[in-house]
Curated annotation (Swiss-Prot):
GO annotations of cellular component type: chromosome; nucleolus; nucleoplasm; nucleus
Post-translational modifications reported in the UniProt record: Phosphorylated in response to nutrient-activated TORC1 signaling.
Cited function: Chromatin-associated factor that regulates transcription. Regulates Pol I-mediated rRNA biogenesis and, probably, Pol III-mediated transcription. Regulates the localization to the nucleolus of Cdk7, a regulator of the Pol I-elongation factor TFIIH. Acts as a regulator of cell proliferation and tissue growth as part of the TORC1 and Myc signaling pathway in response to nutrients. Required in males for both germline stem cell (GSC) maintenance and early stages of germ cell differentiation of germ cell cysts.
Acidic residues: bias regions: 48-73
Disrupted-gene phenotype: Larval mutants exhibit altered cell transcription with reduced levels of Pol I-dependent rRNA biogenesis and, to a certain extent, of III-dependent transcription leading to reduced growth. Displays delayed pupation kinetics and reduced pupal volume. Exhibits reduced number of germline cells leading to fertility defects; female flies have limited fertility, whereas male flies are sterile. In male larvae, germ cells can enter differentiation but spermatogenic cysts cannot develop normally.
Region of interest (Disordered), ranges: 44-84
Name of the protein in question: Periodic tryptophan protein 1 homolog
Lineage of origin: Eukaryota, Metazoa, Ecdysozoa, Arthropoda, Hexapoda
GO molecular function (one): chromatin DNA binding
Domain of life: Eukaryota
Subcellular location: Nucleus; Nucleus, Nucleolus; Chromosome; Nucleus, Nucleoplasm
Modified residues (Phosphoserine): 385
One Pfam family hit: WD40
Gene name tied to this protein: nclb
Length: 459
């Protein structure tokens, strides 16, 4: 009888990924050697946070038990339904309830000494060196109850793709945003913000290879026991957008039905937008107008806010209504009055910010929800879309219609995300739920794409 190997993970997929531009990463990321005191502090802080959450959860449970006596059974069921995470297709409520396991994992890793670099290691190994021609790809990976960020190296010229290093995350990642703003430093950084099932946004320095805690966090759950005030989001963070014009500002959208504009230099919310009927699933700052942010909500509304007046921002929006839930919104990078909207029924809508409430065209692009959209800054009439049905499609569009050009089936199960290489808009990265789970694809490989958009054949 053949020996049985380890069981296959029941959950294994890539829910989020992000490109890092070439030339911004250190050629050799710093490796941190922790002292025993620093190690004890990190483990102690983590354990304290979990103890505080456990105490608060217990107190909330006692209060809920008292309140239950005053409720109808039907009302109680409705409340549970409302509190259930709408993104929880893989039952990650159970994953969050197992948070205590992460502390044990953290302690074991540190005790094993695997985070401490050996002086005898060959630091000149080629794969360790990040070249100016390399892109990094930040890959959020979920495997059963473990969540991690994998930092991949992608070199287009050499056709190389490999994992450089990874680090543990405190919760299941939902969105990743790269930014070069290093809070507290006058120099440009190499940072990323991660939104998770947990309401706290973590910000990591990508030039530090062995980090076991983020550089800083945005938000606090608060603690009655420690008399700590709650601030920031109260539920999962579904999307992030960095303001490239005001580089200290990061926007986040949440299941708690708010958008927060964070001042990263202060580590505090600057503006909170509450004009939503359901969770915010997508948002993006305008590429040129720093005060404008576009949001997509599960209530079927796309809203454009002027954020210059923090007090009046909730009444400043203009709106577009579509059928279904808004899954994606994206500004056109060169024709910046226009934007695309993707919904949970697989429809794409194109609109002009100067025409509130009007849609220029709509097309039933996919049979399932839109999980990614990308414009092309070299070909302004080229649009790509992906869906959880597992396909990539390429569209040729103008102000009146979109025509299907090409499609590709990845056989990776449900495609969860798609992002575009900053230096080559034809090269796209995808995250899915079946091997290889992360894939790179260049749409110029398609003859139909080259012919339609006048792209020369490769030599």
């Amino acid at each position: 009888m053949a020996e049985e190997g380890p069981p296959e993970p029941s959950i294994d997929f890539v829910p989020a990924l992000c490109f890092v531009p070439r030339g911004v990463a250190k050629d050799r990321p710093d490796k941190i050697v922790l002292t025993q005191a620093e190690l004890a502090r990190i483990i102690g802080d983590t354990q304290q946070e979990l103890d505080e959450e456990s105490d608060d959860d217990a107190e909330e449970g006692e209060n809920a038990e008292e309140d239950q006596n005053d409720m109808d059974v039907d009302d109680h069921a409705d409340a549970n339904s409302e509190n259930r995470d709408p993104q929880d297709e893989f039952q990650f409520q159970e994953y969050d309830n197992e948070a205590n396991a992460n502390v044990t994992s953290l302690a074991n890793i540190v005790d094993a000494g695997e985070q401490i670099p050996d002086e005898d290691e060959d630091s000149e190994a080629e794969d360790e060196v990040i070249k100016p021609s390399d892109n990094l790809i930040l890959v959020g990976h979920v495997q059963d109850d473990a969540a991690s960020m994998e930092v991949w190296v992608f070199n287009q010229e050499e056709e190389a793709l490999y994992t450089h290093h990874d680090f543990l995350l405190p919760s299941f990642p939902l969105c990743i945003e790269w930014m070069n703003h290093d809070a507290g430093s006058e120099k440009a950084g190499n940072m990323c913000a991660i939104g998770c099932m947990d309401p706290i946004i973590t910000v990591w320095d990508l030039d530090i290879q062995d980090a076991i805690e983020p550089t800083f966090k945005l938000g606090s759950k608060g603690s009655r026991k420690q008399n700590k005030e709650q601030y920031g989001h109260k539920d999962a963070v579904l999307d992030l957008s960095w303001n490239t014009n005001f580089e200290h500002i990061l926007a986040s959208g949440s299941v708690d039905q708010t958008v927060i504009l964070w001042d990263m230099d202060e580590g505090q919310p600057h503006t909170t937008i509450t004009a939503f009927g359901k969770q915010i699933q997508s948002l993006e700052f305008h590429p040129q107008e720093a005060q404008s942010i576009l949001t997509g909500c599960a209530d079927g509304y796309v809203r454009l806010f002027d954020c210059r007046d923090a007090e009046g921002v909730n009444s400043s929006s203009i709106e577009w209504k579509v059928d279904g839930e808004v899954e994606k919104v994206l500004w056109h990078p060169t024709q910046t009055d226009y934007f695309i909207v993707g919904t949970n029924d697989g429809t794409l809508h194109y609109a002009d910010k100067r025409s509130p409430g009007q849609l220029l065209w709509s097309v039933k692009a996919h049979n399932e929800e839109i999980s990614g959209v990308c414009f092309n800054n070299q070909k302004p009439n080229l649009l790509t879309s992906t869906s959880t049905e597992g396909t990539l499609k390429v569209w040729n569009f103008d102000g009146t219609e979109a025509k299907h050009v090409y499609e590709h089936e990845f056989n990776m199960g449900r495609l969860q995300c798609m992002r575009q290489c900053p230096e080559d808009p034809y090269t796209l990265a995808f995250g899915g739920e079946k091997p290889p789970r992360c894939a790179i694809f260049n749409i110029k490989n398609s003859i139909a794409v080259r012919r339609t958009f006048g792209i020369p054949d490769a030599e």
